[in-house]
Amino acid sequence: MHPLELINKYCPEEKLRHILMLHSRAVADKALSIARNHAELGADETFIEEAALLHDIGIVCVDAPAISCYGTEPYIKHGVLGAEILRREGLERHALVCERHTGTGLTLQQIIAQGLPLPQREMQPVSIEEQIICFADKFFSKTKLDTEKTVEQARRSLEKFGAEGLAKFDAWCERFL
């Protein structure tokens, strides 16, 4: 199934679908640009585009009225909820991108220490495609859809995830920019 068909299936509300599509398209375009500028990484561009378009599909389940999300779950769960949706659709590889893109990825230690309402397991990007999509996502917000963040703005938005997340982001800057 094409990513847009899945988005239409799970996100029938027009305003939310518009937000999701603009954000996801921006992330996909940046991720594809990174992959194309770094052919030595051998990233699967078709998968990057599909997975980037679907990485935030779980927002349809969360309570975030500022971005037209009127579900019942906390926003922090949008990655794992999106992964559940994609697993039901038979898209395991895409599901991993969903659950591993929060911050620069979440460690089991972070999940436990912060008491996050998430499965107690490592949820950090592993494959090069997961890393590229996670990195590209840090440059775009769902509240300022027409603006790409600078590296410094993206870093500031990651401060809440701690020094480990910032170090990973900085390493990705060196590798991908």
What are these regions (language model features)?
Residues 1, 5-7, 146-147, 151:
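Active-site hotspot residues in diverse enzymes, especially metal/ion-binding acidic/histidine motifs
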Residues 12, 40-147, 151:
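Divalent metal-dependent catalytic cores for phosphoryl transfer on phosphate-bearing substrates
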